[in-house]
Curated annotation (Swiss-Prot):
PSII is composed of 1 copy each of membrane proteins PsbA, PsbB, PsbC, PsbD, PsbE, PsbF, PsbH, PsbI, PsbJ, PsbK, PsbL, PsbM, PsbT, PsbX, PsbY, PsbZ, Psb30/Ycf12, peripheral proteins PsbO, CyanoQ (PsbQ), PsbU, PsbV and a large number of cofactors. It forms dimeric complexes. GO terms for biological process: photosystem II assembly; photosystem II stabilization. Its main location: membrane. It comes from the Bacteria. It comes from Synechococcus elongatus (strain ATCC 33912 / PCC 7942 / FACHB-805). This is Photosystem II extrinsic protein O. Belongs to the PsbO family. InterPro entries: OMP/PagP_b-brl (IPR011250), PsbO (IPR002628). Gene3D superfamilies: photosynthetic oxygen evolving center domain (3.30.2050.10), Photosystem II, cytochrome c-550 precursor (2.40.160.30). Keywords: Manganese, Membrane, Photosynthesis, Photosystem II, Signal, Thylakoid. The keyword Ribosomal protein does not apply.
Amino acid sequence: MRYRAFLAAFLAVCLGVLTACSSGPTAADLGTLTYDQIKDTGLANKCLSLKESARGTIPLEAGKKYALTDLCLEPQEFFVKEEPGNKRQKAEFVPGKVLTRYTSSLDQVYGDLALKADGTVSFTEKGGIDFQAITVLLPGGEEVPFLFTVKGLVASTSEPATSINTSTDLRGGYRVPSYRTSNFLDPKARGLTTGYESAVAIPSAGDAEDLTKENVKRFVTGQGEISLAVSKVDGATGEVAGVFTAIQPSDTDMGGKEAVDVKLVGQFYGRIEPADA
């Protein structure tokens, strides 16, 4: 029994090392592991992947309803747009290091997939684990928090199509809710629906114009854009995989500071199937 337990643990470690250096595990890989074997290995944060030879197609018929389920988005590269010191230069995206590496992927996202009247393919997100709080560390030491999400995503192809294949590219926008919720209190106990209206240490300056942004909390909602480029398709199982690129705003500290653009690049996986009548 001890030998079996040791062998199972060894295989889990090996699988974790292999998947850390590859695109991700397959459904068959994870199907052989238990919760204890996956725990603390980072595998739970990885999206499933398909073989490189998966180059099939999934036909779509007009008038029929389809669903995109088990959609997983795993960001692997993070960039933050920084304003240059020289006004003559343009703002550029600077690579950052993610600090929340085990909790950065979206999973079990689902929605409607259909052919629109103009022949283009459209995906409308309905729910799932569709947000993750992430913090990125910049080279200068600044930490940039943001809420990675695809809430309310509506993405479409630019050209008419009759199938999902390796040339399919879905682009669209989504809503980015506030990083903080209404009951959050900042270090000076100020909040949106609870807490003080101003810093306790300076009550006489509570209405000062330069402190308004910090005192008056707001639930700021932003807009993001994403591109889902399909590169692998298994027509037999309905599985699809590919690369995504998303640009969205960072946290504003409930209106206390200006948001900056955050760019995420990673891999995604999903499954297309007929929708229930």
